[in-house]
Amino acid sequence: MPDIPFVLNLDSPDSMYYGHDMFPNRMYRRLHSRQHHDLDLHTLGLIARMGAHAHHLVANKRNGELAALSRGGASNKQGNFEVHLDVGLFQPGELTVKLVNECIVVEGKHEEREDDHGHVSRHFVRRYPLPKEFDSDAIVSTLSEDGVLNITVPPLVSKEELKERIIPIKHVGPSDLFQNGNGHKEAGPAASASEPEAK
């Protein structure tokens, strides 16, 4: 089924349906903007404005156009394998990142607690297969202040590509190179003064 033209027009920033109050209902925003939802925020805002009768219009959006952040997007940028996941509903201590059978596993879980809408408990698990060309020993995970978990994995570097490396300089004691011709160390000023004077 071809895309409906006016739906594409609604995706334009100049559309009359887009304003400064994309989410006029604060409760709607709280419930949907930070959940692991397969729809991007613009689509959710559009549904909020047009009502329940317009939900079928979303089916005409191609999968590649939906934002991946809410469900955890994996991509290869600047040669790295990257995962970005919105985990704003969890505290840092409620999140774990593990490598299991060459898969990056992200888990978030918190027990039942009270919020503005009642009591709620949450639990999710995301798995991202790590391609073999990336270094599983160099995985870096960071959590931003606004609740986005970022995982970066650099590519493997083959030994053939290592053309240059830094050799560390270690500090040691006096050198044995400064010796006289007989293989003995040259006498210092103190040793010369102790020798008997020639008659």
Swiss-Prot record:
Recite the UniProt keywords alphabetically.
Stress response
What's one Pfam family here?
HSP20
Gene3D superfamilies in UniProt? 2.60.40.790
Domain called sHSP: residue spans: 63-170
By its UniProt entry, which PROSITE patterns does this protein fall under? SHSP (PS01031)
From start to end residue, where is composition biased (Low complexity)? 188-199
| Gene Ontology CC annotations of this record | cytoplasm; nucleus
Q: Which GO terms describe its molecular function?
A: unfolded protein binding
Name the Gene Ontology biological process terms. chaperone-mediated protein folding; protein refolding; regulation of autophagy; regulation of translational initiation; response to heat
Provide the residue span(s) of the region labelled Disordered.
173-199
Name the family the entry cites.
Answer: Belongs to the small heat shock protein (HSP20) family.
**This chain belongs to which protein, by name?**
Heat shock protein 67B3
State the taxonomy lineage: Eukaryota, Metazoa, Ecdysozoa, Arthropoda, Hexapoda
Gene encoding it? Hsp67Bc
